[in-house]
Swiss-Prot record:
Gene name tied to this protein: ykt6
UniProt keyword annotation of Transferase present: yes
Keywords annotated in UniProt: Coiled coil, Cytoplasm, Cytoplasmic vesicle, ER-Golgi transport, Golgi apparatus, Lipoprotein, Membrane, Methylation, Palmitate, Prenylation, Protein transport, Transferase, Transport
GO molecular function, one term: SNAP receptor activity
Pfam family, one: Synaptobrevin
Principal location listed in the UniProt entry: cytoplasm
Modified residues annotated as Cysteine methyl ester in this record: 195
Name of the protein: Synaptobrevin homolog YKT6
EC number, as in UniProt: 2.3.1.-
Family: Belongs to the synaptobrevin family.
Entry comment on modification after translation: Palmitoylated; catalyzes its own palmitoylation. Palmitoylation is required for Golgi targeting.
Cross-referenced InterPro entries: Longin-like_dom_sf, Longin_dom, R-SNARE_YKT6, V_SNARE_CC
């Protein structure tokens, strides 16, 4: 999972104006980087130009996904990521960046601004921080921890059982389980195994 580009643009009446952008092109060869950066800048501007105000969209371009959010105040943002990167995290990043940008940069400067004149330096740190969606996004982090816990729990249950022993056999042998509990276990086991392929 990788983020390649994070851009902030102003959607004008005829074209989009790039205000600030940052790129992580380390996965491309040195000789490709300038061409790739130009392509990403062009694509970001084109997507913002063609997006309606107040809209969010994800556009597939080859093996990349371009996530765009254009606010009602004509401020737009684009994240270019690989197809594995979670889109929900991209839109969270765009929300955060555009809110922060609109607080720090006066809206009067948006139509005529350029990367050289706009004083906003947080894009690099946001792109670096969001490279790992699990660390950057609380929801993704909780999901990863939950998946880890399920794996540990499953492994713990397997290790509790002795070699060759099955949970079904233990339930049958148990003196502490009542007949009703044993019947419940068998019924649940049958219902859960109805979809298994033999």
């Amino acid at each position: 999972m990788k983020l390649y580009s994070l851009s902030v643009l102003h959607k004008g009446s005829t074209k989009a104006n790039l205000l600030k952008a940052t790129y992580d092109l380390s996965s491309f060869s040195f000789f490709q980087r300038s061409s790739v950066q130009e392509f990403m800048t062009f694509t970001s501007a084109l997507i913002v130009e063609r997006s309606a105000l107040g809209s969010r969209a994800s556009v597939k371009e080859q093996e990349y996904l371009c996530h765009v959010y254009v606010r009602n105040d004509n401020l737009g943002g684009v994240v270019i990521a690989d197809s594995e990167y979670p889109s929900r995290v991209c839109f969270t990043l765009l929300d955060k960046v555009l809110d922060e940008f609109s607080r720090q940069v006066n809206s009067i400067d948006w139509p005529s601004g350029s990367p050289a004149t706009i004083q906003y330096t947080a894009l690099d740190s946001h792109l670096a921080r969001y490279q790992n969606p699990r660390e950057a996004d609380a929801m993704t982090k909780v999901q990863a921890e939950l998946d880890e816990t399920k794996i540990i729990l499953h492994n713990t249950m397997e290790s509790l059982l002795e070699r060759g022993e099955k949970l079904d056999d233990l339930v049958q042998k148990s003196e502490h389980l009542g007949n009703q509990s044993k019947a419940f276990y068998k019924t649940a086991r049958k219902q859960n195994s109805c979809c298994e392929i033999m």
